[in-house]
Amino acid sequence: MTTELQIGRVIKSHGIRGEVVVEVTTDDPDIRYAPGEVLHGRQTGREHTLTIDTARAHQGRLLIKFEEIPDRTAADSLRGTRFFAPPLEREDDEEGFYDHELEGLRIIHDGADIGVVTGVMHGPAGEILEVELTSGKEVLIPFVHAIVPEVDLEAGTATITPPDGLLDL
């Protein structure tokens, strides 16, 4: 079974010609959102297969026109659609992680298992790990080397060295 990654989400329609605003969640938008690429989307109970006609940057997001979407009304119906694709081939020495690789990792602090990564948030300043502590409390941990110096995918762990108070928030 191939793991699919979420590569974007339709935020809203844009203009009257059927463009949509897409929040991109991939490091390779030039590949994933190239004209002619076929995207597979899911939206509450529906699936879409859409071919990209044009894609252009707009205010930190992409404006995409699909061949199958003729107007704003059709574009409005795509709101909330999430696009998925299989992972791209990576070089063995390439840095970085896919969200699905981080989700489920056990969090280790001072040698103790203190929780598990339940999700990854993407923001303008970088990624943030959503962690559920063994106490049941949820915390957010910036995914930066100073705080998460080691990720061992084979062991299924991420070691953290949080500043004082981070886990108490």
Swiss-Prot record:
Respond yes or no to whether keyword Membrane is given for this record: no
Q: By its UniProt entry, which Pfam families does this protein fall under? A: PRC_RimM (PF24986), RimM (PF01782)
- Which GO cellular component terms, listed alphabetically, does the Swiss-Prot or TrEMBL entry include? cytoplasm; ribosome
Chief localisation class: cytoplasm
**InterPro entries reported in the protein's UniProt record:** PRC_barrel-like_sf (IPR011033), PRC_RimM (IPR056792), RimM (IPR011961), RimM_N (IPR002676), RimM_N_sf (IPR036976), Transl_B-barrel_sf (IPR009000)
Q: Enumerate the spans annotated as PRC barrel domain.
A: 94-166
Keywords assigned by UniProt, alphabetized: Chaperone, Cytoplasm, Ribosome biogenesis, rRNA processing
Molecular function in Gene Ontology = ribosome binding
Gene3D superfamilies to which the protein is assigned, alphabetical: PRC-barrel domain, RimM
Question: Has UniProt tagged this entry with the keyword rRNA processing?
Answer: yes
What is said about its interaction partners and assembly? Answer: Binds ribosomal protein uS19.
The domain-related comment in the record is:
The PRC barrel domain binds ribosomal protein uS19.
Family under the similarity heading: Belongs to the RimM family.
What is this protein called in UniProt? Answer: Ribosome maturation factor RimM
Q: Which organism is it from?
A: Corynebacterium efficiens (strain DSM 44549 / YS-314 / AJ 12310 / JCM 11189 / NBRC 100395)
